Amino acid sequence: MGVITAHCYCFTTVGSHKPYLSPSSHNFRHSPSVSLSSSSSSSPSPLRRISCQASSAPAAESTLTAKVGNGLKDFIHIDDFDKETILKILDRAIEVKTLLKSGDRTFRPFEGKTMSMIFAKPSMRTRVSFETGFSLLGGHAIYLGPNDIQMGKREETRDVARVLSRYNDIIMARVFSHQDILDLAKYASVPVINGLTDYNHPVQIMADALTMIEHIGRFEGTKVVYVGDGNNIVHSWLLLAAVVPFHFVCACPKGFEPDAKTVEKARKAGISKIEISHDPKEAVRGADVVYSDVWASMGQKEEAAYRREAFKGFQVDQNLMDAAGSKAFFMHCLPAERGVEVTDEVVEAPYSIVFPQAENRMHAQNAIMLHVLGK
């Protein structure tokens, strides 16, 4: 069983184009499920008015105690778990994927369970992969889009967490602010899965690791070179490198490096080789995987023209893949802007594994959901 560590991220501004995130230790786990069985007492206790403001801290602490006591977990950061647990989840993903691919539909561990999926940021892959996977394993998923729920605006996140916990067995959220996912996990009495924040994208990296195991035979000890913006995908690769040993290189323009504290955390773990490079051709030499993502993420589209200029020379094209060598695979978390960060030729090449990678979102997430629910 993995060791679970909680984190808090404080946001301050560094430069003009991205937040600087400082991780600090913070214990935030959760509260007991409420029994619906009738009380043995002959008369009900008198009702009292409870102040949400006054009770927020004790409630969060009791949520932590109960969630841990019930064997439930959150999936917020890759490095909340140890290497043994990460590999165990990936093994389970392969096992359940094989079962589903065989056409067997008798494995239904989520029968009678519901999941709320909060989407502050829309996503085809995240919605369909979670909803389909949960359904195939017997559960029912509920989509909550920006018009259904506005955490921190129409309703406080701590209230959303408590309400949804009383309706559901699990909550998945894809949000902008990393603090939103931390608050959901803090106040929810059911497991919370991070479907993406501006800081990290742990479910994607689990799918990536699964894809590498299938195509390379392993991901431990490989060389992964990410070419592009030092964004949430990079942060998740760095957090994985703090748990599992491999060689990770982020090749990005100056001024677009990943969060310095996260880089330092990965280096301090002392198990992986971590490099930040500004020379993509040199960086990709000997790579097992060349990885790319959009240059302007959701919420940065007004910077698209500026970023295209800044990222000249960082497009993944055939010349760059040739520099990587014949064993290199190409990966992309999608959606891709073909002709911008990657050429159409590379996406469609035999060494491109972007579509198996996309499929593995569902299989990796199925295993994550099984793990957090103690199945």
From Swiss-Prot:
Carbamoyl phosphate binds at S123, M124, R125, T126, R174, H201, Q204, C333, L334, R361. The keyword Iron-sulfur does not apply. One of its GO terms (cellular component) is chloroplast. InterPro entries: Asp/Orn_carbamoyltranf_P-bd, Asp/Orn_carbamoylTrfase, Asp/Orn_carbamoylTrfase_sf, Asp_carbamoyltransf_Asp/Orn-bd, Orn/put_carbamltrans, OTCase_ArgI. The active site is at C333 (proton acceptor). Keywords: Amino-acid biosynthesis, Arginine biosynthesis, Chloroplast, Plastid, Transferase, Transit peptide. Its EC number is 2.1.3.3. Coiled coil: none annotated. It comes from the Eukaryota. It catalyses: carbamoyl phosphate + L-ornithine = L-citrulline + phosphate + H(+). GO terms for biological process: arginine biosynthetic process via ornithine; citrulline biosynthetic process; L-arginine biosynthetic process. Homotrimer. Belongs to the aspartate/ornithine carbamoyltransferase superfamily. OTCase family. This is Ornithine carbamoyltransferase, chloroplastic. It comes from Pisum sativum. The lineage of its organism: Eukaryota, Viridiplantae, Streptophyta, Embryophyta, Tracheophyta. The gene is ARGF.
